[in-house]
């Protein structure tokens, strides 16, 4: 049905490659590209499909990307590289006439700040080129938006309150490790919190607001209010929302390590001089922390991510909770990666599938909740991320 190029051979890229290879009726030709070609070759070896091509590319270099795109001629690029590289890859797609999908919005390397505005400005250029760009097609962002669109389509006339809840109840048996790129992860959770209420954004101190929430099959966990990028698009696309928040669980040991990292200056993203060299402390820390790709083998427990929604249907107030639980061990057995990589990589593959099937094909730049959620929801059940519903239960929020 179509040729796909995956950029990035980390944990998420590895999962995307496995899942793409499992669907040969949709993805007829596959290439994996990364700054380090040997990482791509290792992914292909693990999958056991010698027909998957690999290539070396610097995703910060538009000319290199254009040369690769023009050579392989993919119909769609799945960008699971770093968020810093979103704009160079989008530029290369426009120059080469290639469609685009990513899992995280752009953020500049020198400022710990992320928002969709940089990518939304590409809308007219993609429209004029007749190309589709699908933004934020991981789990959160991604499935969280699709869950919201599904709820709006089937369960509510008006969504008023949205709480996205993300729990990782797994144990990787490390003193401290992040589940995806440490640099991106630590930048995200050390920023101020932010939530939307009554038409305004309310800013909080980092991890200032927290409460215990109960997660299916897991139980109560301390959950902390963070700012997460999908809130920005969801309140725009569902203007009836009065309040939208995002919650994530952290254990006390993790938070203690995080405080120490900040207090000793290792979370800094500016350059410091060391032995006559310029280094960024957070990038150095990333080099000595466990690689998220290596956590899967001994990872136990599961993730639970969902949307808790309150709103009106036929004039009456209702609640709706939709979620997925994902086992780290099952994810590892299938792809060699842990559940956090799995829950991001599977939706990215499904989004590309939706495009190649013509179901999510529309010139412009779009967030996932702007498409029909139904065929995507059907594939979640088939591809390893089954969802569950609780109607008119206690949302706790």
Model-predicted regions and their roles:
Residues 59-72, 85:
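Conserved Rossmann-fold cofactor-binding substructure of NAD(P)-dependent oxidoreductases
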Residues 36-38:
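Helix N-cap at the beta1-alpha1 junction of Rossmann-like dinucleotide-binding domains, i.e.
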Residues 12:
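Hydrophobic/small residue at the entry helix of a nucleotide-binding pocket
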Residues 104-131:
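Rossmann-fold NAD(P)-binding glycine/threonine-rich loop
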Residues 47-61:
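Rossmann-fold cofactor-recognition segment
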Residues 69, 75-79, 100-101:
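N-terminal Rossmann-like NAD(P) cofactor-binding module of classical short-chain dehydrogenase/reductase
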Residues 153-397:
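C-terminal catalytic/substrate-binding lobe primarily of soluble NAD(P)-dependent oxidoreductases
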